[in-house]
């Protein structure tokens, strides 16, 4: 009998234990250990970047990226409203102004057709966020960045193994970042990675993550930084996980496509796109959007699934509707109807790497009951 099916369960069945044990046996558990450098080099190579800078989580990677680009009080950054709060938080903490876009109703990524209308003389960067397993349409973003002299910050936190027109996500930004939270295709428990081809940005991020210690006069500081370091133990997990990334991508695609078959006959729900003209879905999560004609919303659907021992998670809540930003006077009068609908009608079901066929069958059966 299958018990509760969690929305995610990480898979740690490679060299994780061996590498972590090596850290403990040698005493190298801090950020100075060899696994940190190895993880940085191998991950950067995987996404075709010159530099990898390991940090303690994906959110701080955004803070460091914004700081490294010297984004400040006179600047605006364009980004999707349908994203995690870390994106806007990094901009606000830098004293800059976030400017949000609505999203595409089918890919759930930022609507790139809206970008140019949002550009002003104060715009310094576009922050793209690849959502839930499909990438942003990058060609228009790159074209606009070149036309207006803007930087691209690429949030690839959910995009491990994802490609756009055959090129790795994470390779498009002036500076890009990844997350290694337990629900990602690569996990270090907590962790993140900044990648870039720019030597100056890489040096700046390395300094910022390490309290801006100086090479020769360690405790004399020319600037303020943070302790954003990744430990050797975390990096050891990352190296082991990276070794199995192709296997993990294949498993995610299998889960997504099997769900597509199992759920295809349920009326009044929108399933994820398997592919677009420029990408193939890696199904980081398996999202479902209820039709407006459904008599209940995502919150009620998740309650009904929970009663059947099925875990689920709501979609992002739009940034322009966040109470904390309303108190700051941000996004007054902003309307993003697609994101607002996705937030109320969207949720995702169990799709972790440890998911079994038997568990998927149970989820599908519960979905049939809930949606009937």
Residue ranges, per PLM feature:
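Active-site PLP attachment segment
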Residues: 171-210, 232-235
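PLP-dependent aminotransferase class I/II
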Residues: 37-41, 46-52, 113, 125-129, ...
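Conserved active-site segment immediately N-terminal to the catalytic lysine
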Residues: 154-188, 217-222
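N-terminal "arm"/small-domain region of PLP-dependent enzymes with the aminotransferase-like
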Residues: 1-29, 350
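PLP-dependent aminotransferase-like
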Residues: 67-156, 163
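Structural detector of well-ordered beta-strand residues that form the stable sheet scaffold
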Residues: 53, 78, 99, 152-153, ...
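Histidine-centered beta-alpha loop that forms part of the nucleotide-sugar donor binding/catalytic region
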Residues: 82, 96, 103, 157-158, ...
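Phosphate-binding glycine-rich loop
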Residues: 29-76, 90-94, 100-102, 167
């Amino acid at each position: 009998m299958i018990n509760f099916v969690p929305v995610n369960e990480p898979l740690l069945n490679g060299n994780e234990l061996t590498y972590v044990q090596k850290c403990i046996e040698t005493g190298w558990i801090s950020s100075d250990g060899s696994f940190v450098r190895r993880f940085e080099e191998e991950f950067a190579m995987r996404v075709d970047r010159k530099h990898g800078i390991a940090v303690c989580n994906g959110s701080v990677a955004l803070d460091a990226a914004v700081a490294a680009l010297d984004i400040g009080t006179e600047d605006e950054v364009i980004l999707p409203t349908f994203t995690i709060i870390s994106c806007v938080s990094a901009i606000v903490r830098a004293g800059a102004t976030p400017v949000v876009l609505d999203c595409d109703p089918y890919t759930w990524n930022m609507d790139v057709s809206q970008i140019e209308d949002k550009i002003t003389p104060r715009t310094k960067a576009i922050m793209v966020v690849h959502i839930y397993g499909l990438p942003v349409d990058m060609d228009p973003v790159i074209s606009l960045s070149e036309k207006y002299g803007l930087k691209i910050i690429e949030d690839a936190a959910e995009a491990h193994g994802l490609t756009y027109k055959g090129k790795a996500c994470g390779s498009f930004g002036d500076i890009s970042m990844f997350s290694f939270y337990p629900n990602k295709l690569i996990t270090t428990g907590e962790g993140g990675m900044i990648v870039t081809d720019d030597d100056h940005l890489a040096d700046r991020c390395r300094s910022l993550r390490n309290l801006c210690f100086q090479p020769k006069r360690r405790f004399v500081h020319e600037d303020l930084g943070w302790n954003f370091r990744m430990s050797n133990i975390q990096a050891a997990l990352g190296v082991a996980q990276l070794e199995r990334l192709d296997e993990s991508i294949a498993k995610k695609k299998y889960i997504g496509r099997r769900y597509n078959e199992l759920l295809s006959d349920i009326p009044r729900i929108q399933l994820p796109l398997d592919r677009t003209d420029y990408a193939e879905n890696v199904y980081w999560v398996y999202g479902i959007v209820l039709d407006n004609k459904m008599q209940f919303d995502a919150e009620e659907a998740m309650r009904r699934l929970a009663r059947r021992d099925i875990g689920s998670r709501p979609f992002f809540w739009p940034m322009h509707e966040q109470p904390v930003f309303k108190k700051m006077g941000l996004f007054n009068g902003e309307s993003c109807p697609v994101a607002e609908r996705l937030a109320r009608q969207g949720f995702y079901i169990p799709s972790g790497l440890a998911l079994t066929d038997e568990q998927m069958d149970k989820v599908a059966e519960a979905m049939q009951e809930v949606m009937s």
